[in-house]
Amino acid sequence: MRYLPLNSEDRSEMLARIGVDSIDALFSSIPEASRLSRDLDLPLRRSEMETQRLLSGMAARNTPASSAPFFIGAGAYKHHIPASVDHLIQRSEFLTSYTPYQPEISQGTLQAIFEFQTQVAALTAMDVANASMYDGSTATMEAVLMAHRVTKRRKAVLSGGLHPHYADVVRTVSKMTDNDALSLPPDVFAAEDLAAEIDEETSCVVVQTPDAFGNLRDLSPLAAACKEHGALLIAVFTEAVSLGLVKPPGAMGADIVVGEGQSIGNGLNFGGPYVGLFATRQKYLRQMPGRLCGETVDADGRRGFVLTLSTREQHIKRDKATSSICTNAGLCCLAFTMHLTLLGEAGLRQLARVNHANAVDLAGRFAQIYGVEVLNRSFFNEFTLRVPGPAAEIVEHLAQKGILGGVPASRLWPGEDLDDLMIVASSEINTDEDRAAFASALRGIA
């Protein structure tokens, strides 16, 4: 795209067309006190080499996840990604985050989305999955809005074990759409406690498994309670690898399953871009947000792929749309699909088993440290410790010893009495030496 600067005559003509005579008049709605009346205090320009040196120095102040034993999770997980994944997604046919506006021309892209949908539906044990959402939190929010549409009710009950950032997104959108989101305290996540909050105004109950503390949940009793009251059960996950080992939410009676797919095929990426997964039952298909890619045959009987449903506001009338999502996380869901395809069903199961075994081994080491308590009865690759003292200080001491050792619960739930809780994750990247070093360092601090 060419850069076409404006001259003074161009500016005058544009200002006259909109009925003002100066730039100052154009911005008259901005109070004088809020305007910058001087030039920006910027340093002199730098050469490309100087700029690279400056930015490299700034980046060197970070501690990369790959440079130290890494046990941080809490919604974003570090896993090994085969080099072939990054290589393949950089092919020119794929290297875009956007779905084409003439999608049927791009059969390769549509087939990749179709395969992604098939994989997500299989992983979650649901009937149908969409072409992806922005991330797990927005997928959760969209699931709540979908439940409101399906049930014609306006109240969502959010488990205390739901990741607090996900709950924040749901509460924000609920406030803007005149809906009600009841967030329970972080210690309220038992099925009977959640069921007690369901009433005739409840459209859905949102529960996470593994939850934000790492606990695995049996959703079956809650699914029965939701069905009895005419509400939907929304199951959330932040660690997609867990689906290779634990019972999928669909098999436990969930009506909508949403979550974060980052841990398959995608790096930590400083918190994004990520890929939201969204799956549901066939009977709710037309209330599902985003796009749905389908398989068909053309006039000559050849297999082909099309966008079967696109009930978003860019395609249909805004008041009829199920969502205002603008695009799907195309490149991220492609990476997800490629990684999962390379693993296969047996490979994913083995990866999940290694994750679980590593976490069990680490928890066993911690259980032998005086003053440290593992709080979880069942977990996948993440669990919560009670430590003797503020967890934030212990995490800082661990970092000084070269170990990135978890997330203080107080960082996720500020204001709650959780200062002595620390959430720890362990995946296939953690060696026996890493786990031994972590346990030794924690023993020295605790």
From Swiss-Prot:
One of its GO terms (molecular function) is glycine dehydrogenase (decarboxylating) activity. Keywords: Oxidoreductase. The keyword GTP-binding does not apply. It comes from the Bacteria. Its EC number is 1.4.4.2. GO terms for biological process: glycine decarboxylation via glycine cleavage system; nucleoside metabolic process. SUPFAM superfamilies: PLP-dependent transferases (SSF53383). It catalyses: N(6)-[(R)-lipoyl]-L-lysyl-[glycine-cleavage complex H protein] + glycine + H(+) = N(6)-[(R)-S(8)-aminomethyldihydrolipoyl]-L-lysyl-[glycine-cleavage complex H protein] + CO2. The glycine cleavage system catalyzes the degradation of glycine. The P protein binds the alpha-amino group of glycine through its pyridoxal phosphate cofactor; CO(2) is released and the remaining methylamine moiety is then transferred to the lipoamide cofactor of the H protein. The glycine cleavage system is composed of four proteins: P, T, L and H. In this organism, the P 'protein' is a heterodimer of two subunits. Belongs to the GcvP family. N-terminal subunit subfamily. This is Probable glycine dehydrogenase (decarboxylating) subunit 1.
